[in-house]
């Protein structure tokens, strides 16, 4: 099983080819390709490469599937005995990213199977 740990949208995510992930909003149009070069770790079978801080020459190629909003989070603040109450909601802007391949020095170590955007195939 091959996977990589990438830094994208202010978070670190473990990604595998053929899967999609919900990440913080990216400024890219749907169906555009997206390349991440901030790769922290790459695992290919028994070989593990750890970057300091990033793995040199490693990239993760993906495709932007859609933009959406996350679940609503309710923030309720109240001060007892003062009749002070605040109720606010927040919905995070998210981007759905489909990972197509993981490459090191231009050589793909893991690629997704032929993928349909509506029904992603999980390799492995």
Swiss-Prot record:
UniProt keyword annotation of Lyase present: no
InterPro entries recorded: bL21-like, bL21-like_sf, Ribosomal_bL21, Ribosomal_bL21_CS
Coiled-coil intervals, chain numbering: none
Source organism, top-level taxon: Bacteria
Alphabetized GO MF terms: rRNA binding; structural constituent of ribosome
Alphabetical UniProt keywords: Ribonucleoprotein, Ribosomal protein, RNA-binding, rRNA-binding
A GO CC term attached to the entry: ribonucleoprotein complex
GO BP term (any one): translation
Disulfide feature: none
Pfam families: Ribosomal_L21p (PF00829)
The keyword RNA-binding appears for this protein: yes
Transmembrane region(s): none
Stated role: This protein binds to 23S rRNA in the presence of protein L20.
Assembly and oligomerization: Part of the 50S ribosomal subunit. Contacts protein L20.
HAMAP family: Ribosomal_bL21
UniProt cross-references to PANTHER family, sorted A to Z: 50S RIBOSOMAL PROTEIN L21, LARGE RIBOSOMAL SUBUNIT PROTEIN BL21M
Family stated for the protein in its record: Belongs to the bacterial ribosomal protein bL21 family.
Protein name in UniProt: Large ribosomal subunit protein bL21
Source organism per UniProt: Synechocystis sp. (strain ATCC 27184 / PCC 6803 / Kazusa)
